[in-house]
């Protein structure tokens, strides 16, 4: 199925690209989320008329994401207290929700879906570097300092 992308989609293309995708992917994901429209003659003409407006909107979203990333990077470190054993292992773990809540309490609103933990949840006391994906192209880093209560 041919679609016109209205937003940058990872591993697929960017704004304005006409790509061929499976019908289910277009029908169930791209079109409902507003990331694409079917590539009919009418939609192609409509898109070309609105191209500058959509590019400006995309640039605004990107600049807002970069501003949020700068705020997150300005925090540098956030401390989370949790119960831990003698060897520094936590009773339980610190996941994306706990990290998002701690960063939000520190002054920058962050959703748990923006927290990236490639090595899994935090299970030890100490400093851990955590990435935040604010936008598909914009990342931020904060050091999470886990201390025992």
From Swiss-Prot:
Keyword RNA-binding annotated: yes
PROSITE patterns reported for this sequence: RIBOSOMAL_L9
Keyword RNA-binding: yes
GO biological process, one term: translation
Protein keywords: Ribonucleoprotein, Ribosomal protein, RNA-binding, rRNA-binding
A single cellular component GO annotation: ribonucleoprotein complex
Signal peptide annotation: none
Domain of life: Bacteria
Entry's Gene Ontology molecular function annotations: rRNA binding; structural constituent of ribosome
Family, per entry: Belongs to the bacterial ribosomal protein bL9 family.
Function, as annotated: Binds to the 23S rRNA.
HAMAP family: Ribosomal_bL9
Protein name as catalogued: Large ribosomal subunit protein bL9
Biological source species: Klebsiella pneumoniae (strain 342)
Gene that specifies this protein: rplI
């Amino acid at each position: 199925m041919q679609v016109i992308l209205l937003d940058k989609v990872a591993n697929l293309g960017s704004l304005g690209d006409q790509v061929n995708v499976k019908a289910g992917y277009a029908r169930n994901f791209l079109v409902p989320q507003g990331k694409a429209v079917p590539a009919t003659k009418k939609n192609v003409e409509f898109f070309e008329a609105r191209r500058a407006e959509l590019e400006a909107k995309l640039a605004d979203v990107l600049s807002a994401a970069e501003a949020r990333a700068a705020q997150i990077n300005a925090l540098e470190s956030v401390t989370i207290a949790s119960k831990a054993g003698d060897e520094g292992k936590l009773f339980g773990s610190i996941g994306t929700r706990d990290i998002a809540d701690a960063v939000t309490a520190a002054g920058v609103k962050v959703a748990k879906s923006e927290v990236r933990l490639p090595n899994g949840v935090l299970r030890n006391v100490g400093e851990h570097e955590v990435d935040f994906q604010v936008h598909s192209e914009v990342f931020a880093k904060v050091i999470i300092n886990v201390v025992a209560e």
